[in-house]
């Protein structure tokens, strides 16, 4: 499986860096946003005013050699500084709030939308890609929205304010300084673009190093058995050498950039000193020493907001990719959607109208069904017809790629037929909601998935309000209690991520117990192909028989010896039923099923003899 979407897919830039698309996520917190913007603006005003305090002190106290009024001046100055500290604390807190709130809402929106997407989306996109959209992209967007907003407001207000004050103090001197602003902007833009490309390359190489390191650890046994230690070392060495070269090149650009900015700032100071000093010594246009000093501070301070704003624009260009990928995820439509009429009556995934749900009995019928995947060209099923009465146990047999999983996926409405209809209790499955159907289906995969948490928490997924007595009865019915009793903490034992702390058989039995609690009318089992011990296999067979009683069931059979009691066995090849009947009937025909069964029986006999 490969990632279908990459960084290069987003070459078209959105207006305003895609930020308007985030407005709905900021609206609930507009009070915090406005308050933060106002306080940041006030902080900018204070930063502009602070050099004026210096000017006043030099001109009125130092130059005149008097201390009259100094106490009041110092008191006012301390109050202003204290006010700025308070504003800064509130700003930082509110920026954190916005980052956390927006990040949380972005994650919720993306995760909730993922719950509504069909299987095809997860087949086409890797887990790593989806994880990056939900976690990395949302974190980066939340950060740039909060801190980027604060930095932009402060730097813009400070930049505009400083230029205005400089022109008020001395417009001729201000022109000399402002004339250098475009030069600084162009220099900053040039170096920032280079640094952005290099930083991106550093991140890419770092990902390669991490991947190579993980492969080296997880594949250590393979590396040793193939005797490729030297090749692995060379590959890892080349990647780390690329990292060294790129990092040094990045550092070189950054050092050059800082040096040029410092030179330009020094040049601006020299201009101010030369021109301002001349004005200070000319009687006609006398300029006070304090005024010259504050002007120099403003000229020097002008460089920082320009650099920051250029860097911010560069970051916005980069984060636009994250915004685009996030909004594309939310815009992705499911291949299987309920019609507006169905949603109106039955509700949707998050707001079901259970009071309108009819009971499901379990009659299933395929009417001239043809199916191909959305991005496929060939049909997996063609003109497929099958009628399964309520309570029938159907076993599906066939080679890999014959269409077995496609059949049960259509029953579960994980995919829609390209042509034809699937009827549930005599009605087109599309006439009722997906949630209604899924609530009445129990699906146990080849490798059952257990959620991180305890055994009890996993069992309650089948029925959240189940009593302990119901849970214990369900476990006993499928013999899961024999596995659970062996665990150190019983029902409170941790199953690990994906159930990794349990054996394959243990996960199977717990998933069966979970299905019993859900009490589905249709049961689907993709039989496990992995080998398990004889005792556990016997327990699983008993569990399957219990689950199938009174329910319509579809079993994708891999071990044919386990389906002898099926009411009907379907032998599928290339999307068509080539044989159907009971085990005895098919064995008497000595057709495709007979060949598969005898071949597997002989193979199992050989394996048992060697074991």
What do these predicted regions represent?
Residues 33-87, 94, 167-172, 274, ...:
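Transmembrane helix-loop-helix hairpins at lipid-water interfaces of multipass membrane proteins
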Residues 63-68, 72-75, 165-179, 249, ...:
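Helix-loop-helix
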């Amino acid at each position: 499986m490969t990632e279908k979407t990459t960084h290069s897919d987003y070459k078209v830039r959105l207006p305003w860096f895609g930020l308007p698309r985030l407005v709905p996520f900021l609206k609930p917190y507009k009070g915090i946003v406005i308050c933060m913007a106002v306080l940041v603006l006030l902080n900018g005003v204070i930063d502009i005013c602070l050099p004026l305090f210096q000017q006043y002190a030099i001109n009125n106290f130092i130059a005149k050699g008097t201390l009259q009024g100094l106490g009041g001046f110092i008191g006012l100055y301390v109050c202003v500084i204290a006010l700025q500290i308070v504003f800064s604390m509130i700003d930082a807190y509110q920026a954190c709030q916005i980052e956390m709130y927006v990040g949380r809402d972005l994650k919720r929106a993306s995760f909730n939308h993922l719950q509504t997407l069909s299987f095809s989306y997860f087949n086409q996109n890797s887990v790593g890609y989806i994880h990056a959209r939900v976690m990395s992209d949302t974190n980066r967007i939340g950060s740039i929205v909060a801190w980027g907003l604060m930095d932009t407001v402060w730097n813009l207000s400070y930049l505009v304010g400083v230029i205005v004050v400089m022109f008020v103090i001395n417009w001729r001197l201000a022109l000399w300084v402002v004339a250098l602003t475009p030069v600084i902007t162009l220099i900053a833009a040039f170096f920032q673009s280079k640094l952005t490309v290099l930083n991106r390359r550093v991140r890419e190489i770092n990902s390669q190093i991490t991947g190579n390191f993980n492969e080296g650890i997880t594949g250590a046994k393979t590396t040793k058995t193939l005797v490729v230690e030297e090749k692995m070392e060379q590959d890892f060495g080349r990647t780390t050498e690329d990292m060294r070269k790129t990092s040094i090149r990045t550092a070189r650009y950054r050092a050059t950039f800082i040096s040029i900015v410092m030179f330009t700032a020094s040049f601006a100071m020299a201009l101010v000193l030369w021109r301002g000093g001349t004005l200070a010594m000319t009687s006609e246009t006398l300029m006070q020493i304090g005024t010259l000093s504050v002007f120099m501070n403003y000229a020097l301070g002008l460089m920082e907001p320009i650099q920051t704003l250029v860097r911010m624009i560069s970051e916005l260009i980069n984060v636009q990719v994250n915004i685009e990928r996030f909004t594309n995820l939310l815009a992705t439509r499911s291949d299987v959607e309920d019609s507006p009429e169905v949603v109106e009556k039955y509700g949707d995934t998050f707001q079901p109208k259970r009071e309108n749900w009819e009971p499901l009995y379990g009659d299933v019928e395929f009417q001239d069904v043809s199916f191909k995947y959305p991005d496929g060209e060939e049909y997996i099923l063609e003109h497929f017809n099958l009628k399964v009465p309520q309570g029938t146990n159907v076993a599906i047999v066939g080679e890999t790629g014959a269409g077995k999983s496609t059949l049960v996926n259509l029953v579960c409405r994980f995919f829609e037929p390209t042509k034809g209809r699937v009827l549930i209790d005599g009605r087109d499955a599309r006439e009722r909601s997906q949630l209604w159907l899924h609530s009445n289906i129990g699906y146990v995969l080849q490798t059952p998935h257990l959620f991180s948490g305890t055994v009890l928490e996993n069992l309650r997924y089948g029925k959240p309000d189940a009593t302990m007595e119901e849970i214990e009865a369900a476990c006993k019915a499928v013999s899961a209690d024999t596995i659970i009793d062996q665990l150190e903490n019983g029902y409170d034992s941790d199953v690990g991520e994906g159930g990794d702390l349990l054996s394959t058989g243990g996960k199977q039995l717990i998933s069966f117990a979970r299905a019993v609690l859900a009490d589905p009318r249709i049961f689907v089992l993709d039989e496990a192909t992995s080998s398990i011990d004889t005792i556990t296999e016997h327990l699983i067979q008993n569990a399957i028989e219990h689950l199938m009683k009174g329910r319509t069931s579809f079993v994708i059979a891999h071990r044919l010896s386990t389906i002898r009691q099926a009411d009907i066995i379907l032998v599928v090849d290339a999307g068509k039923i080539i044989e159907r009947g009971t085990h005895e009937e098919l064995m008497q025909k000595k057709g495709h099923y007979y060949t598969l069964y005898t071949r597997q029986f002989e193979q199992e006999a050989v394996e048992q003899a060697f074991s």
